[in-house]
Amino acid sequence: MTASGTRRARLAEVVGVIGRATDVGLGLPIEHAIRTCLLCVEVGRRIGLDDADLADLYYLALLRMLGCTAGSAQYADLFGDEVRFARDTAHLDYGDGQVFGAWVMGHFAQDQPPATREAMIDHLFTYTPERRRESLSGHCEVAQLFAAQLGVGPAVIDGLGYVFERYDGMGAPSGVPGPRQPVIVRVLTLCNELEVHHRLGGPLAADTVARERAGGAFDPELVAAFCADRDAILAVADGPALWDDLLATEPGPPRGLNEPELFRAPG
């Protein structure tokens, strides 16, 4: 409660709930965004980010998929069950066309009759790189608009425009190479994938993917920092009370939202 009697909510709580909601929308475990956030802060601390940058990284990690509804209709048309598709492909390197194509031919729409499946695959491959760039550009713009309503800092809003980029410049929507991306984005790109592979295959799987994709999707220096103390870093995402860990990990003093800001928050 403020001096004027206006109630205040903690920004970390609101953004944490949004992160959980986007996890559900992507068919991921409900604490994917939280675990990713915890990994981001741990890696960020180890590379020497200050509290201001760590706070921006913290909120960026939780809001990464804030614009996920922007392309829902298009994705449903392309993928059928777009939530299932997002869940089943979360482990793939989207920058490796051969790996992605092999997954589609081996796994996509396997529950459909052969003729239907063939038609669905043909339709899926109309999703050209140009269409993907357009779609992800819309996602980023929606995320940035929503984030501005929450009152997060300009570095978070700016960072949301890069969350689908890659270190090698082969990402989307703009193909910005790693050295020109904010460091908080590069940390998030790595930690988002570390969470998926650690959850699916354990520390060795996370380590293997990090090394294989260094210089491609990931910043090699960040990969080296992770691999130097892999188990200790991954341990922060394995606690029994992840929500409490999330709130305790918020860098700097807790930030609040007053009631009018809360009612403007995306929901």
Show the residue positions of the predicted features:
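Histidine- and acidic-residue-rich, metal-dependent catalytic cores
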Residues: 2-267
